[in-house]
UniProtKB/Swiss-Prot annotation:
UniProt name for this protein: Mitochondrial import inner membrane translocase subunit Tim23B
One GO term describing the cellular component: mitochondrion
Signal peptide: none
One function term, GO molecular function aspect: protein transmembrane transporter activity
Pfam families associated with the record: Tim17 (PF02466)
Membrane topology: Multi-pass membrane protein
Length: 188
């Protein structure tokens, strides 16, 4: 065979490199108990000497006996997602209640069903957005307060909840927009 230059047991042609036609990548053939002759890895980054893969001791991410605790930032994702899902569920129930109330005098037909479905969808999205936004504000305030104070305690939770409530309520009326807290948060 021309250009093959190998023994009869090697595959030749375009795909020869994929099927082990290259040289062995290691100096010792039986380091891991697996014969490595004739192997040619598909990816050069996977060509690792098996001696480096042997572990003498157990390795743990956390020290022995330590409990894994979530920080404020890790809890933020759970809080925001949970509030969005809870808001969607309660909003859907409220939409179903409102839809049934509005269509109780109508004959049971497709337009009535569509109106109920629209109310469920609209109310579910509204409540999910509202609770998700509140959870986002609460989580952001909690992370900022924790990073500023450098402590993780109940005072952060109370302060984050208070600031979230104040910011949420200050956007309700025009008179509240002139409050010092809203002016401070808006930067104007």
């Amino acid at each position: 065979m021309e250009g093959g230059g190998g023994s009869g047991d090697k595959t030749t042609g375009v795909l020869a490199g994929f099927f082990g036609a290259g040289e062995a990548g290691y100096s010792h053939a039986d380091l891991a108990g697996v014969p490595l002759t004739g192997m040619n890895p598909l990816c050069p980054y996977l060509n690792v000497d098996p001696r480096y893969l042997v572990q003498d001791t157990d390795e743990f991410i956390l020290p022995t006996g330590a409990n894994k605790t979530w920080g404020r930032f890790e809890l933020a994702f759970f809080t925001i997602g949970g509030c969005c899902m809870t808001g969607a569920a309660f909003g859907a129930m409220n939409g179903l209640r409102l839809g049934l109330k509005e269509t109780q005098n109508m004959a049971w037909s497709k337009p009535g069903n569509v109106q109920i479905l629209n109310m469920v969808t609209r109310q579910g999205a509204l409540w999910a957005n509202t609770l998700g936004s509140l959870a986002l504000l609460y989580s952001a305030f909690g992370v900022i307060i924790e990073k500023t104070r450098g402590a993780e305690d109940d005072l952060n939770t109370v302060a984050a909840g208070t600031m979230t409530g104040m910011l949420y309520k200050c956007t309700v009326s025009e008179m509240a927009l002139d409050s010092p807290f809203c002016v401070l948060l808006s930067g104007s």
